[in-house]
């Protein structure tokens, strides 16, 4: 297995122009494909998850032109649901932002489809979405284990009506259903069961859907009413925001070691909830400055925090490694859905934090971290999880090197992450 040893980083300073958001990129690509007209996306993320979506759309008959650097994409929309001439098997890697929304969208048109992916994808639940789709008339079956991919889908259209979706495991189930619902033949009423996790990700979905011209009534995130027989309309130009989750590593690096780091592509006007990560850093003692399309972090004296991170679970992972540099015991609460991400992130994070010397308590939906007097050199296993690799790179901001196993797993969302980190540390 390939590994990368990061030597201690003595200073952090500079500016990072963020790659496009994974969440925004894949949502916008799918809606551009379904829309009438042509959409030109700029600052598209070039990564594995986006590549899986693009490959699937091409197989489904969508025409697009991708720039040489793969960050601009002109999509010619179908103006309707997908209706390929032959049965298709679509391999979606470990891309939840492709698997869940495509599973819903493929129910709308005609054709037979198998959706599959990497072994870890077959361990990531999809049952709550499938149950809701079936209630709206979909023909979906599990090919291996109940409630998990791979799926076999027969396009029959969705007839709307009232459906329930459990919101407590993943917001992607609701996102997927919301994006399909406007093309249903009757009005759809979606009722949320349980507490809705990662609510800011639903805001991303609603914002992009509005940009593509459809109407939804949001009743306090408990009920969503979606009129039937709508058409997505291409907005023309669509700028993909920088990835706020990716910003977290650089902002945290400044907080730990600063210097001053400015990240551009997100700011106080961002539609991504993960920009609130900067507020968590501020609560720890970091100096934060906001602009419309940038955030600046400057070093502060970091103190432990005890906080509910249900709304920003991805960025919360960065707090777990920043906690190694804070005074006191940090508690990250209400993050059960870490367990159903690219890996079981609660178990993985606890295991790897202990390797560098931290005292860790892992609960069903929380983790507490007490830093050691000095960090230990360790080989960090990344579990084929991009965020594990990026989070633990921050250990090098101490006086101790850190070895990252399988650093290439960052290709899921940020292929040149380690190059960018090096630029800031020169």
UniProtKB/Swiss-Prot annotation:
Q: How does it assemble?
A: Monomer.
Q: What EC number(s) has UniProt assigned to this enzyme?
A: 2.5.1.19
Q: Which NCBIfam families match?
A: aroA
Give the record's keywords alphabetically: Amino-acid biosynthesis, Aromatic amino acid biosynthesis, Cytoplasm, Transferase
Pfam families the UniProt entry points to: EPSP_synthase (PF00275)
On the tree of life, the source organism's domain of life is Bacteria
Function of the protein: Catalyzes the transfer of the enolpyruvyl moiety of phosphoenolpyruvate (PEP) to the 5-hydroxyl of shikimate-3-phosphate (S3P) to produce enolpyruvyl shikimate-3-phosphate and inorganic phosphate.
Q: Which pathway does this chain act in?
A: Metabolic intermediate biosynthesis; chorismate biosynthesis; chorismate from D-erythrose 4-phosphate and phosphoenolpyruvate: step 6/7
Residues annotated as binding phosphoenolpyruvate are 22, 96, 124, 172, 345, 387, 412
Name the GO terms of the biological process aspect: amino acid biosynthetic process; aromatic amino acid family biosynthetic process; chorismate biosynthetic process
> This chain belongs to which protein, by name?
3-phosphoshikimate 1-carboxyvinyltransferase
Q: Where does it live in the cell?
A: Cytoplasm
Q: GO cellular component annotations, sorted alphabetically?
A: cytoplasm
Query: Which source organism?
Result: Aliivibrio fischeri (strain ATCC 700601 / ES114)
The record's family statement is: Belongs to the EPSP synthase family.
Which Gene Ontology molecular-function terms are recorded? 3-phosphoshikimate 1-carboxyvinyltransferase activity
Which catalytic reaction applies to this protein? 3-phosphoshikimate + phosphoenolpyruvate = 5-O-(1-carboxyvinyl)-3-phosphoshikimate + phosphate
Q: Does the keyword Amino-acid biosynthesis apply?
A: yes
Q: Which PROSITE patterns match?
A: EPSP_SYNTHASE_1, EPSP_SYNTHASE_2
Which residues does the record give as 3-phosphoshikimate binding sites?
Answer: 22-23, 27, 170-172, 198, 314, 337, 341
Gene for this chain: aroA
Please tell me whether the keyword Disulfide bond is annotated for this protein: no
Per its UniProt entry, what is the enzyme's top EC class, as one word? Answer: transferase
Active site location: 314 (proton acceptor)
């Amino acid at each position: 297995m390939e590994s990368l040893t990061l030597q201690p980083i003595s200073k952090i300073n500079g500016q990072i122009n963020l790659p496009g958001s994974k969440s925004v990129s894949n949502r916008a690509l799918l809606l551009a494909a379904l829309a009438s007209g042509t959409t030109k996306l700029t600052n598209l993320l070039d990564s594995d998850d986006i590549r899986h979506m693009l490959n699937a759309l091409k197989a489904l008959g969508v025409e697009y032109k991708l720039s040489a650097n793969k960050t601009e994409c002109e999509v010619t929309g179908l103006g309707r649901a997908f209706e390929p001439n032959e049965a298709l098997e679509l391999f979606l890697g470990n891309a939840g932002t492709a698997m869940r929304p495509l599973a819903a969208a493929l129910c709308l048109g005609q054709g037979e489809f198998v959706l599959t992916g990497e072994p870890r994808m077959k361990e990531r639940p999809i049952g709550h979405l499938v149950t809701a789709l079936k209630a709206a008339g979909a023909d979906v079956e599990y090919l291996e284990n109940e409630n998990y991919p791979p799926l076999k889908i027969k396009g029959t259209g969705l007839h709307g009506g009232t459906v329930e979706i459990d919101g407590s495991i993943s917001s992607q189930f609701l996102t997927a259903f919301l994006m399909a619902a406007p093309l249903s033949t009757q009005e759809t009423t979606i009722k949320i069961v349980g507490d809705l996790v990662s609510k800011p990700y639903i805001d991303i979905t609603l914002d992009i859907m509005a940009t593509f011209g459809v109407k939804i009534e949001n009743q306090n995130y408990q009920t969503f009413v979606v009129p039937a027989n709508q058409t997505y309309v291409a907005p023309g130009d669509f700028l993909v925001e920088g990835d706020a989750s990716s910003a977290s590593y650089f902002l945290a690096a400044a907080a730990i070691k600063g210097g001053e780091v400015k990240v551009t592509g997100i700011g106080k006007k961002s539609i991504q909830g993960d920009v609130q990560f900067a507020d968590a850093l501020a609560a720890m003692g970091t100096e934060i400055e906001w602009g419309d399309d940038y955030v600046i972090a400057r070093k502060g004296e970091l103190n432990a925090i005890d906080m509910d991170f249900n709304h920003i679970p991805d960025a919360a992972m960065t707090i777990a490694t920043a906690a190694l540099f804070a005074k006191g015991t940090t508690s990250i609460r209400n993050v059960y859905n870490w367990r159903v991400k690219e890996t079981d992130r609660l178990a993985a994070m606890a295991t790897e934090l202990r390797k560098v010397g931290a005292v860790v308590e892992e609960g069903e939906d929380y983790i507490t971290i007490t830093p050691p007097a000095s960090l230990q050199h360790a080989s960090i296993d990344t579990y084929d999880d991009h965020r594990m690799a990026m989070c633990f790179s921050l250990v090098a901001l101490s006086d101790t090197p850190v070895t990252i196993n399988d650093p290439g797993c960052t290709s899921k969302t940020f292929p040149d992450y380690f190059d960018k980190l090096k630029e800031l540390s020169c």
